[in-house]
């Protein structure tokens, strides 16, 4: 197994076997391997050692949430998980304040309310789609505004992993000549 807390030790076992001609598969129980996943480091290490890596398209919460959001999908930015540090998270969100593309984030249930509060404070009350437990039995998409989502999840405890799809900043239209 290869995960955040054992990746150095596991890589020391996996890489020599791959260099010796064996094959391996990187599988994740949390969506597409290597996307907001420690497998990203293993793919990089393989590349550094000249090991060919192939990907078989699989579940992607980002694309699933975008497709189900009802928000613009032509151009988007995927920001992964925000920092757990309050200061770093707010600084990150400040860089997105004027982003015109649709914004996609991952969030854990225990941090959802705090993140929605920060989104509201920094981005304002934009449209948002919250995808929960995508492609699973209890799949749910909530299409609302950031403020309404904040009220909803303050009142009911969030469960499951979330993908947040947020409308980008409005494009300023200059004067017509």
Question: Which role fits each region the language model picked out?
Answer:
Residues 12, 37, 65-67, 89-91, ...:
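Short, well-ordered secondary-structure micro-motifs
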Residues 41-99:
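Class I SAM-dependent methyltransferase SAM-binding "motif I" and its flanking Rossmann-like core
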Residues 16-19, 42-44, 69-74, 122-123, ...:
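Short, hinge-like loop/turn segments at secondary-structure boundaries
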Residues 32, 59, 82, 86, ...:
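Conserved phosphate/pyrophosphate-binding and hydrolysis machinery centered on Walker-type P-loop NTPases
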Residues 1-56, 64:
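Class I S-adenosyl-L-methionine
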Residues 19-24, 102-177:
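A contiguous loop/helix-start segment that scaffolds small-molecule binding in enzyme catalytic cores
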Residues 28, 55-58, 105, 130:
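General beta-strand structural signal in soluble alpha/beta enzymes
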Residues 1-8, 59, 80-85, 133-136:
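Short, acidic/turn-prone active-site loops that include or flank metal/cofactor-
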């Amino acid at each position: 197994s290869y995960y955040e807390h054992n990746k150095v030790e596991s890589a020391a076992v996996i890489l020599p076997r791959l260099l010796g001609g064996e094959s391996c598969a990187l599988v994740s129980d949390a969506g597409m391997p290597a996307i907001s996943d420690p497998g990203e480091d293993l793919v990089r290490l393989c590349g550094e050692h000249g090991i060919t890596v192939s990907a078989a398209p699989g579940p992607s919460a980002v694309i699933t949430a975008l497709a189900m959001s009802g928000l613009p999908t032509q151009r988007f930015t995927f920001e992964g998980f925000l920092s757990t540090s309050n200061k770093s998270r707010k600084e990150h969100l400040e860089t997105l304040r004027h982003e015109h593309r649709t914004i996609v984030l991952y969030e854990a249930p225990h941090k959802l309310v705090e993140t929605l509060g920060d989104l509201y404070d920094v981005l304002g009350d934009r449209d948002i789609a919250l995808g929960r437990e995508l492609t699973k039995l209890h799949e749910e998409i909530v299409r609302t505004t950031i403020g309404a989502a904040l009220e909803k999840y303050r009142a009911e405890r969030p469960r499951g992993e979330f993908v947040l799809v947020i409308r980008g900043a409005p494009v300023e239209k200059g004067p017509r000549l």
